[in-house]
Amino acid sequence: MAPKPDPGRRVVADNRSARYHYAIEDTLEAGIALTGTEVKSLRGGKATIGESYAGPSGNDLMLFNAYIPEYLEANRFNHDTKRPRRLLLHRRQINKLIGATQRQGYTVIPLKIYFNDKGRAKVELGLGKGKQLHDKRESVKQRDWDRDKARLMRDKG
C-alpha cells in the first residue's frame, strides 16, 4: 500500500526518473519565483520537470527547462512556458550547491514541485551524481530482489 501524502502538501509535478538516472545524496526545499499565470497553471496540476535541472546564473540558482504550460484563461499576458525560473534559497545554500556542481561534479535536479500547507509553490531539489549504466542495472536488480523478497515473506506469513 502506498504511503499517504501529507495533507498540506499537494504534489503538482514529480520527476520519477531522477532517482534512476542520479544517485541522490542530499535533498532540500526551495521556493520558486513565479508569475501569476504560472501559479494558476500549476494549480491546475500541469507541469513537467522530467528534463529540467538547476544551475547557477550569476549569483543566483535558476531552474532551467521546466515546462509550465500557458494558462488558458489568460490572453496576451501569458508567460513563456520554458523560461528560466529563479530559485529562492539562502545565500549559504546557494553557495553550497554552486560549489558542489562546479568543484565536485554534482548535479542539482528538481525532484518535485508542490504546494505547501500555506499555498506556496515549492521545489524539492536533489543533489546527486549521474549513474553509469552498470549502476542502473544494479539498482534494477536490487529493486526486483526486494520485491521478490517481500512477496515471499507475505506469502509465507
From Swiss-Prot:
Give the main location.
Answer: cytoplasm
Q: Which UniProt keywords apply?
A: Cytoplasm, RNA-binding
Q: Would you tell me the protein name for this molecule?
A: SsrA-binding protein
**BP term (GO), one:** trans-translation
Query: Positions of the region Disordered?
Result: 131-157
Which Pfam family, any one of them, does this sequence belong to? Answer: SmpB
**Can you quote a single GO CC term?**
cytosol
User: Molecular function (GO) terms listed?
Assistant: RNA binding
Extract the PROSITE patterns matched here: SSRP
Q: Which NCBIfam families match?
A: PRK05422.1, smpB
Give residue spans, biased composition: Basic and acidic residues: 132-157
Please name the SUPFAM superfamilies in this protein's record. Answer: Small protein B (SmpB)
Regions annotated as coiled coil = none
The task this protein performs is described as:
Required for rescue of stalled ribosomes mediated by trans-translation. Binds to transfer-messenger RNA (tmRNA), required for stable association of tmRNA with ribosomes. tmRNA and SmpB together mimic tRNA shape, replacing the anticodon stem-loop with SmpB. tmRNA is encoded by the ssrA gene; the 2 termini fold to resemble tRNA(Ala) and it encodes a 'tag peptide', a short internal open reading frame. During trans-translation Ala-aminoacylated tmRNA acts like a tRNA, entering the A-site of stalled ribosomes, displacing the stalled mRNA.
Question: In which family does this protein belong, per the annotation?
Answer: Belongs to the SmpB family.
Q: In its keyword annotation, does this UniProt entry include Cytoplasm?
A: yes
CDD domains named in the record? SmpB
Q: Which organism is it from?
A: Methylorubrum extorquens (strain PA1)
Tell me the compartments it is located in: Cytoplasm
